[in-house]
Regions:
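Short S/T/G/P-rich N-terminal loop/turn motif that feeds into the first structured element of a domain
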Residues: 1-47, 55-58, 80, 84-97
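Mid-chain, well-packed structural core segment of small domains
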Residues: 50-68, 72
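Conserved short beta-strand edge segments in small beta-sheet-based binding/regulatory domains
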Residues: 70-82
Length: 97
């Protein structure tokens, strides 16, 4: 299953985070250890979006927790599917035959 994880840092916390570049690199390293499909950083806001392919949420608990601690906010976690995978999911759910 693919998951999209999105975190945002408010301006006040952002100043604290930017003063700890080693913590930012540590967080990025934890996500990179999962070989993400993609990692994106907003150029206009303090946001980070990561897309991982994992069997379940347990696989990325450590970087998720590190993100929560660093940003002082709960990241959003969305299970997602590609347009090619979506019909199979609908079929498993009994929505289409």
């Amino acid at each position: 299953m693919k998951y999209m994880i999105h975190g945002e840092i408010d301006p006040e916390t952002g100043v604290e985070v930017e003063a700890q570049p080693d913590k930012i690199q540590e967080l990025i390293g934890k996500w990179q250890a999962l070989n993400p499909i993609g990692m994106y950083f907003s150029l206009t806001r303090r946001t980070m979006t990561i897309i991982v392919d994992a069997p379940n949420e347990d696989a990325f608990f450590e970087p998720l927790h590190a993100m929560w601690v660093l940003t002082k906010d709960y990241p959003d976690v969305y299970p997602v599917a590609s347009v090619d995978e979506f019909p199979q999911i609908l079929q498993r759910a009994g929505i289409i035959g």
